UniProtKB/Swiss-Prot annotation:
Cross-referenced InterPro entries: CNK1-3_SAM (IPR049628), CNK2/3_dom (IPR010599), CNKSR (IPR051566), CRIC_domain (IPR017874), PDZ (IPR001478), PDZ_sf (IPR036034), SAM (IPR001660), SAM/pointed_sf (IPR013761)
Gene that this polypeptide is encoded by: CNKSR3
Pfam families named among the record's database cross-references: CNK2_3_dom, CRIC_ras_sig, PDZ, SAM_1
Domain PDZ: 211-293
Residue stretches spanning the membrane: none
Functional description taken from the UniProt entry: Involved in transepithelial sodium transport. Regulates aldosterone-induced and epithelial sodium channel (ENaC)-mediated sodium transport through regulation of ENaC cell surface expression. Acts as a scaffold protein coordinating the assembly of an ENaC-regulatory complex (ERC).
Organism lineage: Eukaryota, Metazoa, Chordata, Craniata, Vertebrata
Name of protein: Connector enhancer of kinase suppressor of ras 3
Domain of life: Eukaryota
Length: 555
């Protein structure tokens, strides 16, 4: 970029044509006086008065735009966060020292005068200018994404507002100075803390200029940039539209400042004049951008994509069986080299209701797959429903493993069970005083070890028969409602937990590979066809024996 001090009078006139509309009436006066770039950077209120710019407001607009050119010309290679903080600290110290030295003077009239001296107001203006230069850095990437710098920025803004409000109040100068000293001391503390606590190299890195070419712009396509202009004429890019020319260039990032458009400096211009300059050449645009350092704040200045919601594409066919793993998704995102703002991927819902699957992708309740060995731990999600798959595998292993159920070998080869016809006594436990009927009781091993309450195996078995893990129940055809009896079949029935929590019913014994069942205190041996023992069917119940003993005692 050519220094502003080397500008010709024509370049100065071209620059003034992009300023505010109210200043266009003075363009011919700049052209008539043939003011070059070096004279422009040194222009003052008196020079503008001689040019014919008599209105104070118009003079301030010109001088603010010239200040931006001075910062671009003289401060590009020297301005960084550390220097800006030091400048703000120096300005606050100067103001504090001025007030202290003035109060030591014998001619001090702060307690009686309501008019602040010009030197005091000038020091306040310099302090606010230094704060504005620092805020211009803190208000952009990468500092906007850091909490500490955001808090510092908000504090400085509030202190500057308090400072400007204080000097405009109608009060004694001494009271005004007291409030200003309070603000200055807080600013000094913020600057000292920022310098001491921040050790990142980005504090000492300066900005740089980069030229970006956007060729082959299609008619009606646009550049795809979002630009925010400050009140004094800085143009900052806040984002780019996805797949736009600006996005495809991979060189335009959020926080970049537009300095030139097609070799024309646009610093201090109105936004509408900048847009007009961007549309001047429909075939392509050459931009000169001022880029801030990124440092090691874990911030990558990638394009800020359009934040408007993009509706997903309508699926006309079922989704494919294979889903993309997070590892492959991560690799793809790295290849695209788009960071800073990540695209959220929301997986589509499955085409069919969810059923747990094993690692091979087959259903776990199909009746043909067995899990005889513990499954390995999850190696990563393989589908949007991977958490449910892993949870299902974990629960199967915890409950169905024979090592976890000592004395009760349980297989996971579960066959669908048929639902019996509901009777008036359905779900009610058998009274303990009733005799054990061999027609409906299962086989009990008299030498089996009794199970104590609270055992881990029993808890696991009860969980196994809860309504969350039993196989689908198939409705059986109607049968005569026998009380406590079933048609004689070759299958043995055992007592288990019903699918209704808290009740008991009799389910197929094929669910177990062992004849041992819980609740052994309620079971007896079944009558065998080849054995002559009939004690299990003829033995009186406990209640009958109690009545017999009672009669003996009464006699």
């Amino acid at each position: 970029m050519e220094p502003v001090t080397k500008w010709s009078p024509k370049q100065v006139v071209d620059w003034t044509r992009g300023l505010d509309d109210c200043l266009q009436q003075y363009v011919h006066k700049f052209e008539r006086e043939k003011i070059n770039g070096e004279q422009l950077l040194q222009i003052s209120h008196q020079d503008l008065e001689e040019l014919g710019v008599t209105r104070i407001g118009h003079q301030e607009l010109v001088l603010e735009a010239v200040d931006l050119l001075c910062a671009l010309n003289y401060g590009l290679e020297t301005d960084n966060m550390k220097n800006l903080v030091l400048k703000l600290r120096a300005s606050s110290h100067n103001l504090q020292n001025y007030i202290s030295s003035r109060r030591k003077s014998p001619a001090y009239d702060g307690n009686t005068s309501r008019k602040a001296p010009n030197e005091f107001l000038t020091s306040v203006v310099e302090l606010i200018g230094a704060a504005k230069a620092l805020l211009a850095w803190l208000d952009r990437a990468p500092f906007t994404g850091i909490t500490d710098f955001s808090v510092t920025k908000n504090k400085i803004i509030q202190l500057c507002l308090d400072l400007t409000t204080t000097v405009q109040k109608d009060c004694f100068v001494a009271e005004m100075e007291d409030k200003v000293l309070t603000v200055v001391k807080v600013l000094n503390g913020i600057c000292d803390k920022t310098i001491r606590s921040t050790t990142d190299p980005v504090m000492s890195q300066c900005a740089c200029l980069e030229e970006v070419h956007l060729p082959n712009i299609k008619p009606g396509e646009g550049l795809g940039m979002y630009i925010k202009s400050t009140y004094d004429g800085l143009h900052v890019i806040t984002g780019t539209t996805e797949n736009s020319p600006a996005d495809r260039s991979q060189k335009i990032h959020a926080g970049d400042e537009v300095i030139q458009v097609n070799q024309q400096t646009v610093v201090g211009w109105q936004l509408k004049n900048l847009v007009k300059k961007l549309r001047e050449n429909p075939t392509g645009v050459v931009l000169l951008l001022k880029k801030r350092p990124t440092g090691s704040f874990n911030f990558t200045p990638a394009p800020l994509k359009n934040l408007r919601w993009k509706p997903p594409l309508v699926q006309t066919s079922p989704p494919p069986a294979t889903t993309q793993s997070p590892e492959s998704t991560m690799d793809t995102s790295l290849k695209k080299e788009k960071s800073a703002i990540l695209d959220l991927y929301i997986p589509p819902p499955p085409a069919v209701p969810y059923s747990p699957r094993d690692e091979n992708g087959s259903f776990v309740y199909g009746g043909s797959s067995k899990c005889k060995q513990p499954l390995p731990g999850p190696k990563g999600s393989e589908s949007p429903n991977s958490f449910l798959d892993q949870e299902s595998r974990r629960r199967r292993f915890t409950i169905a493993d024979s090592d976890q159920l000592p004395g009760y070998s349980v297989e996971t080869n579960i066959l669908p069970t048929k639902m019996r016809e509901k009777t008036p006594s359905y779900g009610k436990p058998r009274p303990l005083s009733m005799p054990a009927d061999g027609n409906w009781m299962g086989i009990v091993d008299p030498f089996a070890r009794p199970r104590g309450h609270g055992r881990k195996g029993e808890d696991a078995l009860c969980r196994y028969f809860s309504n969350e893990r039993i196989p689908p129940i198939i409705e059986e055809s109607s049968s005569p409602p026998y009380r406590f009896s079933r048609p004689t079949t070759e299958r043995h029935l055992v007592r288990g937990a019903d699918y209704i929590r808290g009740s008991r019913c009799y389910i197929n014994s094929d669910l177990h590979s062992s004849a041992t069942i819980p609740f052994q205190e309620e079971g007896t041996k079944k009558k065998s066809g080849s054995s002559a023992t009939k004690s299990s069917s003829t033995e009186p119940s406990l209640l009958v024996s109690w009545f017999t003993r009672l009669k003996l005692l009464t006699h």
